[in-house]
Regions:
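Flexible glycine/proline-rich, aromatic-decorated loop/lid segments
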Residues: 208-222
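Acidic/His- and Gly-rich active-site-bordering loop/insert found
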Residues: 2-132, 151-159
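Acidic-enriched catalytic cores of C-N bond-cleaving enzymes acting on peptides and small amides
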Residues: 200, 209, 230-295
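Predominant activation on well-ordered alpha-helical scaffold segments within soluble catalytic domains
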Residues: 31, 58, 140-143, 147, ...
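Short small-residue beta-strand/loop micro-motif enriched in glycine and branched aliphatics
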Residues: 127-129, 225-231
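Structural signal for hydrophobic packing residues in well-ordered secondary-structure cores
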Residues: 19, 61, 65, 150, ...
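Acidic/histidine-rich catalytic neighborhood of metal-dependent amide-processing enzymes
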Residues: 126, 131-210, 277
């Protein structure tokens, strides 16, 4: 009888290479993806961006019963976007998976001896290679997990799945906003799983239900045309730098505490969120950023 535990065991065997395929499990699959130099930050790689989707991801998804399409980016000069869907029953929930197959520059000459950007290399319990952690490894794991569920349940998931994989994330996801706006109905789903972010600690699987947002704006003080000499006019004319410093100081105090009430959730952090975060480890030190307790 099909079970959740059975699907997890199938996925585990595939990841560990402990299955009928032997060593050609997830590591071999990821090695093939890493070997495609699909960097979005180097000129002349357009063919590799297409090859990653058309030669690797689309055939895999189609083998699992997805209908997949590769679209040109709405903005010229940026990588294509793949969408795919597998609808078992429109009345059932739909999951949308996001990933990106492009990587940062290879920087071949900056890797230490024994490592290359487009070759998957295992050292201890770590795998090295461009895309292993950002983001080929993540979306490959998600698709492999779906494959394990399909195998366990005789070709049925019990829910619908849509996939979007872009090839311009490392250039600011240029064109993705326009693409989503134009295909909003096709990408409609009940839940989004975007596996592209850090763990709180390398050994701790992390589910993030939200991320810090940002709002960009220019804060400008224009008092006069041209500049004046501080030796002649210092202390007599208004200094725009001081005005800006006080404006920034009214937004956040010296310890990073936000002072603008409208930027904070009403009533503070919800109790459910506090409970979910209780006991959650926070990384720091080593290769990570230093955690400042007072900030």
């Amino acid at each position: 009888m099909a079970s959740r535990e059975g699907a997890i065991e199938r996925a585990r065997r595939f990841f560990d290479g402990d299955n009928a395929q032997g060593a050609s499990g997830f590591k071999a699959l990821l090695a093939e993806l890493v070997a495609i130099p699909s960097t979005a930050q180097e000129e002349g790689r357009e063919a590799e961006l297409h090859r990653y989707l058309d030669g690797a991801i689309r055939p895999w998804l189609e083998r699992l019963g997805f209908r997949a399409t590769i679209h040109p980016n709405p903005l010229p000069g940026f990588g294509p976007i793949l969408t795919a869907e597998r609808i078992e029953d429109p009345a059932r929930p739909t999951v949308l998976l996001y990933g990106h197959g492009d990587t940062v520059r290879g920087l071949d000459d900056q890797w230490r001896e024994g490592l290359k950007p487009w070759t998957l290399t295992e050292e201890g319990d770590r795998w090295y290679g461009r895309g292993t952690a950002d983001n080929k490894g993540q979306h490959a794991l998600n698709i492999a997990a779906l494959e394990a569920v399909l195998a366990e349940r005789g070709g049925k998931l019990g829910f619908n799945v849509k996939v979007v994989i872009e090839m311009a994330e490392e250039r600011g996801s240029k064109g993705l906003r326009e693409f989503v706006a134009a295909h909003a109905r096709d990408l409609a789903a009940d839940v989004l799983i975007a596996s592209d972010g850090p763990r709180v600690e390398p050994e701790v699987p992390t589910i993030a239900t939200g991320t810090r947002g940002s709002f960009h704006f220019d804060l400008v003080v224009r008092l006069r045309e041209g500049g004046v000499h501080s030796g002649h006019w210092g202390g007599l004319t208004t200094d725009p730098a001081i005005i800006l410093a006080h404006a920034l100081g009214s937004i956040m105090d010296r310890n990073g505490r936000i002072l603008v009430r409208g930027w904070l959730p009403a009533g503070g952090v919800p109790p459910a969120v506090k409970a979910g975060l209780e006991g959650c480890p926070v990384g720091g030190g080593g290769e990570a950023a230093t955690i400042d307790p007072g900030w």
